[in-house]
């Protein structure tokens, strides 16, 4: 089981899931900054 979690596909899925979670949480607290990064 340990070998499964150390595999590259699992690491990639975990990285994408973590990044998506950070973006979602950031967008929840600061909804305008994601769509207007330069203050336009």
UniProtKB/Swiss-Prot annotation:
It is a single-pass membrane protein. Its main location: membrane. Keywords: Membrane, Photosynthesis, Photosystem I, Thylakoid, Transmembrane, Transmembrane helix. It is found in: Cellular thylakoid membrane. SUPFAM superfamilies: Subunit IX of photosystem I reaction centre, PsaJ. InterPro entries: PSI_PsaJ, PSI_PsaJ_sf. GO terms for biological process: photosynthesis. The chain crosses the membrane at residues 4-24. One of its GO terms (cellular component) is plasma membrane-derived thylakoid membrane. It holds the Pfam family PSI_PsaJ. It comes from the Bacteria. May help in the organization of the PsaE and PsaF subunits. Belongs to the PsaJ family. HAMAP family: PSI_PsaJ. This is Photosystem I reaction center subunit IX. It comes from Prochlorococcus marinus (strain MIT 9313).
